[in-house]
Amino acid sequence: PGRAGAVRVGNILYVGGHTAPQQFRGKLGAEITVEQGYEAAKLACLACLADVKAAIGDLDKVKQVAKLLCMVNCVPDFGQQPLVANGATDLLSELYGDSGAHARSAVGMGSLPNSACIEIEMIMEVTD
């Protein structure tokens, strides 16, 4: 109660944070490589898209991906968060072309829930 995977306000869909599967637990720069983080970002993005589909019924109703926030669980001196976040960006570009182009923040975190290596949030414009 009180939490939804995605919330629609008018034509804007806010997608809450999603993480990658259990095998992608740990910190970038320690247990997780950049390549593994890239794959984890793709999978976290797919988890977001599952909630998008549940909220609006059809992924073709996405008009524009507006914003992506990629939170990367990493060691303090890790500076390759954008390379990890590219996993999600590349997937959205592949799926939506120009409509997948988005503003993005890729930030390092000291920890994430359940030791997830990445958590992703999205904001999208959708149609009926």
Question: What is each of the regions a protein language model found here?
Answer:
Residues 1-128:
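Short, polar/acidic, helix-capping and beta-turn segments at strand->helix junctions
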